[in-house]
C-alpha cells in the first residue's frame, strides 16, 4: 500500500491505495471520501519547480501511483492553494538528546 495525500489550503486528505492505481482512480476515491458527487469537477495539481501546477485531464489516467506522493486539489476553476503548516518551520532543526 502507498499513501497519497490530496491537499487544499489547510486540509489534507490521506488515502491508502494499491501501487499501480492511476491518479484518475485515486481522484474517484477522493470524491467519495469528501462525499462529492461523481460528476463533480476537481482540478488536480502536482508540485513542480516550487509551485503547484494543474495536471491535464489525460495525464490523470496516464499517471500511475507507485510510491507515497501528494497532489493539490481544487473545485472547478479555483486556484490550487496549499498552505504550508507552521509546524514545518519549527521542525527544521532536530534536537539531539
UniProtKB/Swiss-Prot annotation:
It comes from the Eukaryota. GO terms for cellular component: cytosol; nucleus. This is Uncharacterized protein C685.08. It comes from Schizosaccharomyces pombe (strain 972 / ATCC 24843). The lineage of its organism: Eukaryota, Fungi, Dikarya, Ascomycota, Taphrinomycotina.
Amino acid at each position: 500500500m502507498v499513501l497519497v495525500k490530496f491537499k487544499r489550503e489547510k486540509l489534507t486528505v490521506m488515502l491508502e491505495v494499491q501501487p499501480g492505481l492511476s491518479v484518475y482512480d485515486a481522484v474517484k476515491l477522493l470524491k467519495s471520501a469528501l462525499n462529492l458527487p461523481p460528476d463533480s469537477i476537481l482540478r488536480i495539481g502536482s508540485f513542480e519547480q516550487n509551485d503547484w501546477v494543474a495536471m491535464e485531464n489525460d495525464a490523470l489516467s496516464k499517471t500511475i501511483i507507485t510510491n507515497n506522493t501528494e497532489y493539490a486539489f481544487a473545485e472547478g476553476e479555483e486556484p490550487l492553494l496549499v498552505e504550508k503548516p507552521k509546524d514545518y518551520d519549527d521542525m527544521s532543526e532536530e534536537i539531539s538528546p
